[in-house]
UniProtKB/Swiss-Prot annotation:
GO terms for molecular function: acetyl-CoA carboxylase activity; ATP binding; carboxyl- or carbamoyltransferase activity; zinc ion binding. This is Acetyl-coenzyme A carboxylase carboxyl transferase subunit beta. Zn(2+) binds at residues 38, 41, 57, 60. The gene is accD. Binds 1 zinc ion per subunit. NCBIfam families: accD (TIGR00515). Component of the acetyl coenzyme A carboxylase (ACC) complex. Biotin carboxylase (BC) catalyzes the carboxylation of biotin on its carrier protein (BCCP) and then the CO(2) group is transferred by the transcarboxylase to acetyl-CoA to form malonyl-CoA. Residues 34-289 form the CoA carboxyltransferase N-terminal domain. InterPro entries: AcCoA_carboxyl_beta, Acetyl_CoA_COase_Trfase_b_su, ClpP/crotonase-like_dom_sf, COA_CT_N, Znf-ACC. A zinc finger (C4-type) spans 38-60. Its cofactor is Zn(2+). Belongs to the AccD/PCCB family. Its EC number is 2.1.3.15. Keywords: ATP-binding, Cytoplasm, Fatty acid biosynthesis, Fatty acid metabolism, Lipid biosynthesis, Lipid metabolism, Metal-binding, Nucleotide-binding, Transferase, Zinc, Zinc-finger.
């Protein structure tokens, strides 16, 4: 009797592998990319709803960063956009170590030829020339090919007597190309001066973030300057400026709302209204084309 009292209890043993298999089979699976977290308010958003809302949070209005392909889809009449100069190739003029490999890798990852897509299309049946920068390609940095493609697009707009719209997003000049990158500021600005002499319309749409040499040149030369809500727009970084002037800057400094309040831009336009606003502006100025 005492022997049975202190007998070791027998347990059913389950291997760790069986437990993991059970969890895997009985846990609901959610496909990758179905839900997205808003980086401003923290709301979990259904991807399909987000796309229907032009990639803007339906709770706080935060505008997610989008690429050139998405902008083309949202902006132009269906099947009217024709891309220009996609075969223009980036070189490595300074023989910067690793630059060639980096460019090829980014091309493969993004399926983009460079940090800007240029071409012609129709908005509400009105033809326009457009240049759309893309942050996925080296943070939209401005190298010699970016400057060349934008300049060519402006020159074609002059030949075709069409308005120009440029969507900016950039971290600034591309350091791997040195002075050749910086000279694109003057090159594009010079082409825009010719566009202005011809009396043609130039609209610039500033998106998050627009900084550095792009801000210091063609981003701020538009006849009409629009911006998306809460976009970061500036030349040097906020902390750099604070350390230089030894003063604390306003919390919303370099945001599109701050720039509108101080007269640097003309209007803040939510992405969902952008096509309608651009169509209205082009229609108002079409007699000058």
């Amino acid at each position: 009797m005492l022997k049975n009292l202190f007998r070791k209890t027998k347990y059913i043993t389950v291997s760790q592998k069986n437990i993991e298999n059970y969890k895997r089979e009985n846990t609901p699976t959610i496909p990758d990319g179905m839900w997205v977290k808003c980086n401003k308010c923290g709301e979990i958003l259904y991807q399909n709803d987000l796309e229907k809302n032009y990639m803007a949070c339906n709770l706080c209005g935060n505008h997610f960063r989008i690429g050139a392909k998405e902008r083309i889809k949202y902006l132009f009449d269906k099947d009217t956009f024709k891309e220009w100069d996609y075969k223009v190739k980036t070189e490595n003029p300074l023989s910067f170590k690793g630059y060639d490999e980096k460019i090829e890798n980014i091309k493969e990852e993004t399926n983009l030829s460079e940090a800007v897509t240029t071409g012609k299309g129709k908005i509400a049946d009105m033809e326009v020339v457009v240049c759309i920068m893309d942050s996925k390609f080296m943070m939209g940095s401005m190298g010699s090919v970016v400057g060349e493609k934008i300049t060519r697009a402006i020159e074609r707009a002059i030949e075709l007597r069409l308005p120009v719209i440029i969507f900016t997003v950039s971290g600034g000049a591309r350091m791997q190309e040195g002075i050749l990158s910086l000279m694109q500021m003057a090159k594009v600005s010079s082409a825009l001066a010719k566009l202005d002499e011809e009396g043609l319309l130039y609209i610039c749409v500033l998106t998050d973030p627009t900084t550095g040499g792009v801000t210091a040149s063609f981003a701020m030369l538009g006849d009409i300057i629009l911006a998306e809500p809460d976009a970061l727009i500036g030349f040097a970084g906020k902390r750099v400026i604070e350390q230089t002037i030894n003063e604390k800057l306003p919390e919303d400094f370099q945001k599109s709302e701050f720039l509108l309040e101080h007269g640097f831009i003309d209007k803040i336009v939510p992405r969902s209204d952008l096509r309608k606003v651009l169509a209205k502006l082009i229609n108002m100025h079409k007699n000058s084309f």
